Amino acid sequence: MANICDTQYKVMGERKAVADLWNTLQTMEVNTKNVYLYKLAEHYGIDYEKMGISVRGHIYWAEFEADEDICLLSFDTESAWSACEEFFDELNKVLGGELSVSYREIECGCDIFYVHDEQGFFPEECCVSSSGEPFEDACEDIFDTCQDAIAKWCEKMGISQGDRT
């Protein structure tokens, strides 16, 4: 696959629509094996090729939570270059437009850190990607504020921020 975009999704909405998607993911054995987005598109009858929608990726983890008031489906994807938001918009239409889809996508190789948050799930302000000494392997860290990111970077580098902003 191309550069890999890691995206976390939080889906809320009408219980029937959220449960339908969760049941489909379970049928496709999510959390045991990858659920490829093109297979999900085919399951729901979405002609992604005709529509020019990217489904190049997979869901590798999912979790469903429900009580009397809230129905929440969380899942993570890896996709090529960027999130597949057009696919999930189309999936929402197929499920009756009853879903609220929030997501955070990160692909540092393409300078992507984007948040679409309808429910307040992703308060983070920035993402820092680094590799080499003193970071060992490449790392991506998400921070609530840019100031938190600067403080962490200064700590790892062993330097003082001083009066610099």
Q: Can you say where each PLM-predicted feature lies in the sequence?
A:
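Intrinsic low-complexity, intrinsically disordered or marginally ordered coil/linker segments
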Residues: 1-165
